[in-house]
A protein has these predicted regions:
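Helix-loop-beta substructure at the N-terminus of cytosolic sensory domains
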Residues: 20-59, 67-69, 121
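GAF sensory/regulatory domain recognition
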Residues: 45-90, 134
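Short hydrophobic/glycine-rich mini-motifs in sensory/regulatory modules
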Residues: 127-137
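Signal-transducing coupling segments at domain and membrane junctions
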Residues: 98-121, 141
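A short, aliphatic-rich beta-strand micro-motif
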Residues: 120-128
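Signal-transmission linkers at sensory-effector interfaces
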Residues: 1-26, 37, 170-180
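Short beta-strand-to-loop transition segments that serve as allosteric relay/switch motifs
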Residues: 135-145
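Amphipathic alpha-helical "output/dimerization" segments
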Residues: 145-166, 176
Length: 180
């Protein structure tokens, strides 16, 4: 229970930090930046799935000092590379990798993709709406102390991510409509 309260306080602080910014993109970036620093991770990211193709795109990323951004290399990523993640997401499960070597034999494509980014461990949860997975949100190289708790934390954040992305999409649509 103590951890849940800590997570809720962290989320509230992240929301407050994000509300200091004027645009949805700035708010999302501030939100994940705050969480990344608070968690002590190397990288936090959001991937949004294409509704028309079997691809996913890294749309937001925060990196700790000294960590190389990967967002530019993770556009139009075939979902086949991480199909097993989606199989887990469909069952309501998160991805927890304590040691990248654990997946080397069973998931060689995923291993190659992830180890090439200097990822040793990660926790990833899906987000969605209307009972459909729309993407995922992950943390690379989090502290090893509480992986299970981190999945609870990410599950709590998922609804907020969906809300922030919906606000962003409405903002984009209203700007597009204003041009006509």
């Amino acid at each position: 229970m103590e951890k849940i309260i800590k997570y809720e306080l962290t989320i509230n602080k992240a929301i407050r930090a994000s509300l200091e910014y004027g645009t949805p993109d700035e708010q999302i970036n501030a939100f994940i930046r705050f969480l990344g620093k608070e968690i002590g991770a190397d990288r936090i990211y959001i991937f949004e799935d294409s509704q028309n193709e079997n691809i996913t795109n890294n749309t937001y990323e925060w990196c700790a000092d000294g960590v190389r951004p990967e967002i530019d290399h993770l556009q139009e990523l075939s979902m086949d590379v991480i199909k097993w993640w989606y199989d887990c997401f469909e069952k309501g499960e998160s991805i927890i990798i304590h040691d990248m070597e654990e997946i080397k034999e069973d998931h060689p494509d995923s291993y190659k993709l992830l180890s090439g980014q200097n990822i040793n461990r990660l926790v990833v949860s899906s987000f969605g709406s209307d009972c459909e997975i729309r993407g995922f949100f992950g943390v690379d190289n989090p502290p090893e102390s509480d992986f299970r708790g981190l999945t609870v934390f990410l599950d709590m954040i998922a609804a907020l991510i969906v809300s922030l992305l919906k606000i962003r999409n409405k903002d984009i649509e209203s700007k597009r409509m204003a041009r006509f």
